[in-house]
Amino acid sequence: MKKIQIAIDGPASSGKSTVAKIIARNLDLIYLDTGAMYRVATFVALQKETDDAKEIIEFIEKNPISFMNGQKGQEVLMGSENVTEVIRTNEVTNTVSKISAMTEIREFMVAEQQRIAKNGGIIMDGRDIGTVVLPKADLKIFLVASVDERAERRYKENLSKGIPTDLERLKIEISERDRKDSTRAISPLKQAEDAILLDSTGKTINEIVQFIEDKAKELM
């Protein structure tokens, strides 16, 4: 069986991570959460109150990002510290576009992601996987959904974690995040020419997963 690379790109809260994790489990692939890696860098920036890319990178090099399967699914570590929950706060969410747009940060993260992915058998999701990180991925999906649907998903997710959230505020934040991600100078959010456009509005997670798995199995 061929060890393929799957790239899933799309805007914030379009369901990329949820879908990628399920597919990774079903098809026995490694799931590399690229968004979490940039969130870790953002968390470091906020903790250290710095926007110096070199300082952020040096700290992460001393406390490498890694992933492990925990009781509630995949957990994110920075060195020995479990940062799974703290990198999902609204403060991190609203700052991650700024940090991830830094050239030095992106180059560092892309090199790390490519190193992990080079042997295949991997699925990655993010903003520029199919265009920058894995331009030769076997299967590329560009997953989108309406702002209202994405806000509703994030709202329910935050409530389930006990995070106080205002739905209308979320809609504004997601729209602004879309604008930032699509217009930034470095690796803007855009669909790769050879990616399959998949609109998840009104679709269940199972329907999305099944569609992508069927495409993947044709290549394996």
UniProtKB/Swiss-Prot annotation:
GO biological process: nucleobase-containing small molecule interconversion; pyrimidine nucleotide metabolic process
Keyword terms of this UniProt record: ATP-binding, Cytoplasm, Kinase, Nucleotide-binding, Transferase
Any Pfam family matching the protein: Cytidylate_kin
Compartment(s) where it occurs, according to its Swiss-Prot or TrEMBL record: Cytoplasm
Principal location listed in the UniProt entry: cytoplasm
Record-annotated membrane-spanning stretches: none
Record EC number: 2.7.4.25
Domain of life, source organism: Bacteria
Binding residue positions for ATP: G10, P11, A12, S13, S14, G15, K16, S17, T18
Reactions catalysed according to its record: CMP + ATP = CDP + ADP; dCMP + ATP = dCDP + ADP
Disulfide bridges in this chain: none
HAMAP family hit by this protein: Cytidyl_kinase_type1
NCBIfam families: cmk
Record-stated family: Belongs to the cytidylate kinase family. Type 1 subfamily.
Protein name: Cytidylate kinase
UniProt organism field: Lactococcus lactis subsp. lactis (strain IL1403)
Lineage of source species: Bacteria, Bacillati, Bacillota, Bacilli, Lactobacillales
